[in-house]
């Protein structure tokens, strides 16, 4: 038996249609907050790629931490890309779970070998990758080198 690919949950990424309305609901109904807001523009400057192809995407995000786990609400601002497609197909909801991994390079290499690398970029000095683990785990895994900060995609 091999060792775990991840050893801790860091973030829950939720794709939403209306960021402000969702934040109000999370605050009013569930007591989750306070929130930090950011606009994230991804593209050539941070070597953003979806399925290996260069792309440009814009999102608004809101981030709150609950019990040591970051909740990231993502509102796609363009009609393309993995978040916009998820919103169109599913109507929103949990898109990914970010996990701590003991070996970022191996996790990414394995995903590349299995055609499961959905997204790769650099943001705020951290390398980020989305691994397509939906078939096996029912959700996309996000892995990173270093520690993601507020406004991490």
What is each model feature region?
Residues 1-48:
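Long, hydrophobic N-terminal alpha-helical segment
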Residues 1-4, 9-17, 61-70, 72, 86-103, 105, ...:
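Vicinal oxygen chelate
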Residues 33-85, 127-148:
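Conserved short beta-strand elements that form part of the metal-binding/catalytic scaffold
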Residues 22, 26, 97, 107, ...:
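Hydrophobic pocket/interface hotspot
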Residues 7, 55-57, 122-124:
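Short solvent-exposed loop/turn micro-motifs enriched in small/polar/acidic residues
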Residues 1-4, 84-90:
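Short, flexible, solvent-exposed loop/turn segments with mixed acidic/basic and small polar residues
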């Amino acid at each position: 038996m091999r060792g775990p690919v991840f050893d801790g949950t860091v973030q829950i990424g939720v794709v939403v249609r209306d960021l402000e309305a969702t934040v109000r609901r999370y605050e009013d109904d569930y007591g989750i907050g306070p929130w930090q807001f950011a606009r994230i523009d991804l593209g050539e400057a941070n070597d953003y790629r979806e399925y290996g192809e260069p792309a440009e995407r814009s999102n608004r995000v809101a981030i709150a931490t609950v019990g040591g786990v970051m909740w990231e609400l993502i509102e796609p601002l363009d009609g393309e890309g993995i978040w916009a497609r998820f919103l169109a197909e599913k109507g929103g909801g949990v898109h990914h779970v970010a996990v701590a991994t003991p070996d970022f390079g191996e996790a990414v290499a394995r995903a590349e070998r299995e055609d499961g690398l959905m997204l790769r970029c650099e943001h705020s000095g951290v390398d980020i990758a989305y691994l397509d683990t939906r078939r096996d785990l029912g959700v996309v895994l996000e892995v990173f080198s270093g520690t993601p900060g507020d406004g991490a995609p």
